A protein has these predicted regions:
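Alpha/beta-hydrolase fold catalytic core
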Residues: 1-67, 94-97, 137, 317-318
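Conserved alpha/beta-hydrolase catalytic His-Asp/Glu region
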Residues: 35-38, 178-180, 198-257
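Active-site loop/oxyanion-hole signature of alpha/beta-hydrolase fold enzymes
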Residues: 51, 58-60, 101-142, 310
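Conserved HGGG/HGGXW glycine-rich cap/lid loop of the alpha/beta-hydrolase fold
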Residues: 62-109
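Flexible "cap/lid" loop of the alpha/beta hydrolase fold
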Residues: 156, 165-194
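Short beta-strand/loop motif that positions the catalytic acidic residue
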Residues: 258, 264-266
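Acidic catalytic loop of the alpha/beta-hydrolase fold
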Residues: 269-273
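Catalytic active-site module of serine/aspartate enzymes centered on a nucleophile-bearing elbow/loop
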Residues: 288-289, 293-318
Length: 318
């Protein structure tokens, strides 16, 4: 019996030793959100108390615009992903748009929600509650990746509030053969993914971003640091993991019910959500336009911000 137990004990001891080494080398504590606010909540950032959270948002441009542009970011991202696009649109004297963007629950400086609910209906309700607080009655809603999925679901739930939709590499259809980022792959693995609560080295974020961006020159030290630090914001890692654990497939049949004019923007080299999905959206949404960006990855608003900003402006002004 003792001889039979020895290999098992040896394996367990080796596993524990590896864990100890990993924790001693790579384990990182959460960063207090108040500390991160000093760096990432500069003007025009504001905070809105909503649903037990302090929602980080920015409201820029023409305050009299009757139909603001709402921008939603993707998983493990933040409102900062739209910085360059917003700057171009707001600075255009011909475009008198109001642009509102915010950190979704689980991400950025908004952080986790008290209910620990990250299902699709929760996000739809959150967006509606946020827009109601700002007294937004009509809007154009735009989103990337997770944010894109939230955008079209919100448009279906509240068609009277949405004039137009803009989808950038959006979720919606079952994923097939995509490579996915290293971070997302680990987050999807049962049991092992719990290590991400403590071990999220900057090198992992860099490796993931190198999958997200087609042009690796965009994976700068500043960009890696931003994604890494905001992931480490207190509670965000646990919230992100909860999101992955609770994630359920969307119903692509619902997409055919979208009536609003829709602009579909896609990076042709997207390794997370294949460009094939862009053509599915185009096929299923009757009143839609498709804009494919060659040599661009999963987040075109960062990698090809000039073309994205111009496409958005042209679409809104139609």
């Amino acid at each position: 019996m003792k001889k039979m137990m020895r290999p098992l004990l040896y394996t367990l001891s080796s596993f524990l030793l590896v864990l100890i080494i990993l924790f001693s080398v790579y384990a990182q504590r959460d960063i207090p959100v108040e500390k991160l606010k000093l760096k990432y909540a500069q003007s025009p950032s504001k905070f809105l108390p909503l649903m037990g959270m302090q929602v980080h948002y920015r409201d820029e441009g023409n305050p009299n615009d009757p139909s603001p542009l709402i921008l939603l970011h993707g998983t493990s991202s933040s409102l900062n992903t739209w910085d360059s696009v917003v700057k171009i649109i707001v600075s255009n004297p011909k475009n008198k748009k109001r642009i509102i963007r915010f950190d979704l629950p689980a991400f950025g400086l908004t952080g986790p929600n008290p209910e620990n609910d990250y299902a699709s209906p929760y996000y739809t309700n959150f967006v509606d509650s946020f827009l109601n607080m700002l007294q937004i009655k009509k809007c154009t809603i735009s989103g990337n990746s997770l944010g894109g999925g939230i955008a079209w679901q919100y448009a279906l739930a509240h068609p009277e509030k949405v004039n137009k939709i803009i989808l950038l590499d959006a979720t919606g259809y079952p994923q097939k053969n995509e490579k996915g980022s290293l971070g997302f792959k680990i987050a999807s693995l049962p049991i092992i993914n719990n290590l991400l609560l403590f071990i999220t080295p900057k090198s992992l974020i860099k490796k993931s971003l190198e999958t997200v961006f087609y042009d690796k020159s965009f994976v700068t030290e500043a960009t890696v640091t931003r994604y890494h630090e905001l992931l480490l914001s207190a509670g965000n890692r646990r919230a992100t993991l909860s999101l992955f654990k609770s994630r359920r497939p969307l119903n692509p049949k619902e997409i055919k019910s979208i009536q609003q004019p829709t602009l579909i923007i896609w990076g042709e080299q997207d390794q997370l959500i294949s460009v094939d999905n862009a053509y599915l959206f185009k096929q299923d949404i009757k009143n839609s336009q498709l804009f494919i960006l060659p040599n661009v990855g999963h987040i075109p608003m960062e990698e090809s911000y000039v073309k994205v900003a111009n496409a958005i402006q042209n679409f809104i002004n139609q």
